Protein backbone atom coordinates (compact mmCIF):
# COMPACT_ATOMS: atom_id res chain seq x y z
CA UNK A 1 0.00 0.00 0.00
CA UNK A 2 1.25 3.48 -0.85
CA UNK A 3 0.73 5.27 2.47
CA UNK A 4 2.04 8.55 1.07
CA UNK A 5 -1.27 9.03 -0.76
CA UNK A 6 -3.00 9.22 2.63
CA UNK A 7 -0.75 11.96 4.05
CA UNK A 8 -2.13 15.49 3.84
CA UNK A 9 0.36 18.28 3.30
CA UNK A 10 -0.58 21.61 4.84
CA UNK A 11 1.46 24.50 3.46
CA UNK A 12 2.70 27.28 5.74
CA UNK A 13 1.66 25.53 8.96
CA UNK A 14 2.49 25.92 11.79
CA UNK A 15 4.51 28.81 10.35
CA UNK A 16 5.29 30.25 6.92
CA UNK A 17 7.61 28.13 4.80
CA UNK A 18 6.73 24.83 6.51
CA UNK A 19 4.98 22.03 4.62
CA UNK A 20 3.35 20.11 7.48
CA UNK A 21 2.87 16.37 6.95
CA UNK A 22 -0.43 15.45 8.61
CA UNK A 23 -0.84 11.77 9.50
CA UNK A 24 -4.39 12.16 10.81
CA UNK A 25 -5.58 11.39 7.28
CA UNK A 26 -3.88 7.99 7.56
CA UNK A 27 -5.80 7.42 10.78
CA UNK A 28 -9.04 8.54 9.11
CA UNK A 29 -8.78 5.49 6.86
CA UNK A 30 -9.07 2.20 8.72
CA UNK A 31 -7.31 0.24 5.99
CA UNK A 32 -4.34 2.64 5.86
CA UNK A 33 -4.07 2.91 9.66
CA UNK A 34 -4.28 -0.86 10.00
CA UNK A 35 -1.65 -1.35 7.31
CA UNK A 36 0.74 1.10 9.00
CA UNK A 37 0.20 -0.62 12.36
CA UNK A 38 0.71 -4.08 10.85
CA UNK A 39 3.97 -3.04 9.18
CA UNK A 40 5.37 -1.75 12.47
CA UNK A 41 4.18 -4.89 14.29
CA UNK A 42 6.07 -7.05 11.75
CA UNK A 43 9.19 -4.96 12.31
CA UNK A 44 8.80 -5.23 16.10
CA UNK A 45 8.23 -9.00 16.11
CA UNK A 46 11.51 -9.48 14.27
CA UNK A 47 13.22 -7.70 17.19
CA UNK A 48 11.60 -9.63 20.05
CA UNK A 49 10.22 -6.47 21.66
CA UNK A 50 9.05 -6.54 25.30
CA UNK A 51 7.51 -3.06 25.53
CA UNK A 52 6.63 -0.15 23.24
CA UNK A 53 7.51 3.43 24.16
CA UNK A 54 6.12 6.54 22.51
CA UNK A 55 6.42 10.27 23.12
CA UNK A 56 3.27 12.33 23.38
CA UNK A 57 1.10 12.79 21.57
CA UNK A 58 1.47 11.11 18.23
CA UNK A 59 3.83 8.47 19.57
CA UNK A 60 0.80 7.26 21.56
CA UNK A 61 -1.30 7.07 18.39
CA UNK A 62 1.30 4.88 16.72
CA UNK A 63 2.60 2.90 19.70
CA UNK A 64 -0.60 1.89 21.47
CA UNK A 65 -2.12 -0.12 18.60
CA UNK A 66 1.27 -1.76 18.01
CA UNK A 67 1.58 -2.76 21.68
CA UNK A 68 -2.03 -3.99 21.75
CA UNK A 69 -1.53 -6.05 18.58
CA UNK A 70 1.54 -7.68 20.12
CA UNK A 71 -0.02 -8.28 23.53
CA UNK A 72 2.64 -6.21 25.29
CA UNK A 73 2.67 -3.00 27.31
CA UNK A 74 3.05 0.62 26.29
CA UNK A 75 5.08 3.18 28.26
CA UNK A 76 4.40 6.88 27.60
CA UNK A 77 7.02 9.61 27.40
CA UNK A 78 5.43 12.89 28.50
CA UNK A 79 6.24 16.52 28.96
CA UNK A 80 7.24 17.53 32.45
CA UNK A 81 4.38 17.69 34.95
CA UNK A 82 2.07 15.29 33.09
CA UNK A 83 2.87 12.00 34.86
CA UNK A 84 1.53 11.48 38.41
CA UNK A 85 4.18 9.25 39.98
CA UNK A 86 7.94 9.51 40.41
CA UNK A 87 9.67 10.19 37.09
CA UNK A 88 13.04 10.44 35.47
CA UNK A 89 13.60 13.42 33.21
CA UNK A 90 15.72 14.44 30.26
CA UNK A 91 16.24 18.03 29.16
CA UNK A 92 17.26 18.79 25.59
CA UNK A 93 17.76 21.81 23.38
CA UNK A 94 15.26 23.12 20.88
CA UNK A 95 15.89 25.75 18.23
CA UNK A 96 14.72 28.44 20.67
CA UNK A 97 15.01 27.13 24.22
CA UNK A 98 14.78 23.73 25.88
CA UNK A 99 12.25 20.98 26.45
CA UNK A 100 11.96 18.36 29.18
CA UNK A 101 10.55 14.87 28.69
CA UNK A 102 9.79 12.40 31.47
CA UNK A 103 8.91 8.75 32.08
CA UNK A 104 7.74 6.97 35.20
CA UNK A 105 10.85 5.65 36.91
CA UNK A 106 9.44 2.09 36.84
CA UNK A 107 8.10 2.13 33.26
CA UNK A 108 10.97 0.05 31.90
CA UNK A 109 12.68 -2.83 33.66
CA UNK A 110 16.44 -3.32 33.20
CA UNK A 111 17.10 -5.53 30.20
CA UNK A 112 13.70 -5.05 28.57
CA UNK A 113 13.80 -4.83 24.79
CA UNK A 114 12.14 -1.61 23.69
CA UNK A 115 10.59 -0.37 20.46
CA UNK A 116 10.19 3.42 20.32
CA UNK A 117 7.47 4.72 17.98
CA UNK A 118 6.54 8.17 16.74
CA UNK A 119 4.71 9.68 13.82
CA UNK A 120 7.60 11.56 12.28
CA UNK A 121 11.38 11.86 12.36
CA UNK A 122 12.40 15.46 11.73
CA UNK A 123 15.44 16.79 13.63
CA UNK A 124 15.61 13.76 15.95
CA UNK A 125 15.59 15.66 19.25
CA UNK A 126 12.46 14.10 20.70
CA UNK A 127 13.45 10.55 19.80
CA UNK A 128 16.97 11.08 21.09
CA UNK A 129 15.45 12.21 24.41
CA UNK A 130 13.18 9.13 24.51
CA UNK A 131 16.22 6.90 23.89
CA UNK A 132 18.10 8.56 26.76
CA UNK A 133 15.16 7.97 29.12
CA UNK A 134 14.79 4.30 28.15
CA UNK A 135 18.50 3.66 28.52
CA UNK A 136 18.64 5.50 31.85
CA UNK A 137 16.12 2.93 33.12
CA UNK A 138 18.21 0.05 31.78
CA UNK A 139 16.11 -0.69 28.71
CA UNK A 140 17.63 -1.82 25.42
CA UNK A 141 16.37 0.07 22.37
CA UNK A 142 16.11 -2.63 19.70
CA UNK A 143 14.20 -0.57 17.16
CA UNK A 144 12.67 2.78 16.35
CA UNK A 145 9.68 3.07 14.01
CA UNK A 146 8.19 6.11 12.31
CA UNK A 147 5.36 6.63 9.88
CA UNK A 148 7.30 9.45 8.17
CA UNK A 149 10.95 10.47 7.92
CA UNK A 150 11.84 13.94 6.65
CA UNK A 151 15.25 13.00 5.24
CA UNK A 152 16.17 16.57 4.38
CA UNK A 153 16.25 17.50 8.09
CA UNK A 154 18.86 14.77 8.73
CA UNK A 155 17.41 13.68 12.09
CA UNK A 156 18.72 10.18 11.43
CA UNK A 157 22.20 11.43 12.37
CA UNK A 158 21.16 11.72 16.03
CA UNK A 159 19.99 8.11 16.11
CA UNK A 160 22.31 6.51 13.55
CA UNK A 161 23.54 3.89 16.03
CA UNK A 162 20.03 2.39 16.28
CA UNK A 163 17.91 0.26 13.98
CA UNK A 164 15.34 2.59 12.41
CA UNK A 165 12.44 2.03 10.03
CA UNK A 166 10.15 4.53 8.35
CA UNK A 167 7.11 3.70 6.26
CA UNK A 168 7.27 6.93 4.23
CA UNK A 169 10.15 9.26 3.46
CA UNK A 170 10.35 12.74 2.01
CA UNK A 171 13.59 13.91 0.44
CA UNK A 172 12.53 17.56 0.29
From Swiss-Prot:
This is Adenine phosphoribosyltransferase. InterPro entries: Ade_phspho_trans (IPR005764), PRibTrfase_dom (IPR000836), PRTase-like (IPR029057), UPRTase/APRTase (IPR050054). It is found in: Cytoplasm. Belongs to the purine/pyrimidine phosphoribosyltransferase family. It is an enzyme of class 2 (transferase). Its main location: cytoplasm. The keyword Glycosyltransferase applies. Pathway: Purine metabolism; AMP biosynthesis via salvage pathway; AMP from adenine: step 1/1. It comes from Staphylococcus haemolyticus (strain JCSC1435). One of its GO terms (molecular function) is AMP binding. Its EC number is 2.4.2.7. GO terms for cellular component: cytoplasm. One of its GO terms (biological process) is adenine salvage. Homodimer. Catalyzes a salvage reaction resulting in the formation of AMP, that is energically less costly than de novo synthesis. It catalyses: AMP + diphosphate = 5-phospho-alpha-D-ribose 1-diphosphate + adenine. Keywords: Cytoplasm, Glycosyltransferase, Purine salvage, Transferase.
